[in-house]
Amino acid sequence: RLRIESTVIPNVFDFENPPIKSDGYGDDFKKEMGISSDEIIVLQPTRIVPRKGIELAISLCSKIQKKLDKKICLVVSHLYGDEGSQYYEDLVKLALENSLKVVWAGERVGESRGLNHAGEKIYNLWDIYPMADFVTYPSLYEGFGNALLETFYFSKPVLVNRYQVYKDDIEPYGFKVVSIDGEITENTVKDTIKLLSDDSLVEEWTTHNYSICEEYFSHKLLRSTLEKLVSRSLE
């Protein structure tokens, strides 16, 4: 509107250096959380606040569970925030009504490893990503979507609710995701089941997504953009 030239610098991640091999710290996470080896793990890597749309993740998982002869375990990684516990309580009730197992892992997941107040082992999110079979990101709105970039970094298939910033700034790059517009449809369930049962399709999608991120959301891009801006300012 003001006809001022600008340069957009996106959120970035270290896609030049793929995740390192696990050091084994998180190997006991499933046992500690009561997750059996035959359960499909769906990770919701967010806090428990209404704008994260976690009820959509519960809906997806419960519908998949009804169609598959396998149990689904939804792992919600973080605690509820200062917005209160009502949303969390509503989600617990919804999961029970749908006979869905949910691991509320917030007391055991933190920014860094260590022990909690009860002397229990604390994991970080990077300990959990490798064991996820699928990731849900059904946010109603976001400032950008750092957890989505993190999901691409760990090469995991993902469901995304098409919040506005995603539609404007991320979707145009052509990522392969299971996308929804505020509801879990029959096609959503079919597409997710297809990914859960086809490793080659998962590899195709995640490799495609990673390559896009390497080009457009990497530290390399950030360095290049900043160098150009600094050079331009010195002219």
What are the functions of these language-model segments?
Residues H78, S85-D127:
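Nucleotide-activated donor-binding/catalytic signature segment of Leloir-type glycosyltransferases, i.e.
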Residues V12:
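Carbohydrate-associated surface elements
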Residues S197-S231:
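A charged, aromatic-enriched C-terminal amphipathic alpha-helix characteristic of glycosyltransferases
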Residues P19-I35, D90:
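A short helix/loop element that forms part of the nucleotide-sugar donor recognition site in Leloir-type
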Residues L140:
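Aromatic "clamp/platform" in nucleotide-sugar-dependent glycosyltransferases that forms part
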Residues V135-T136:
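A short hydrophobic beta-strand element within the catalytic core of glycosyltransferases
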Residues S36-K52, I58-C61, L74-V76:
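Conserved donor-binding/catalytic core segment of Leloir-type glycosyltransferases
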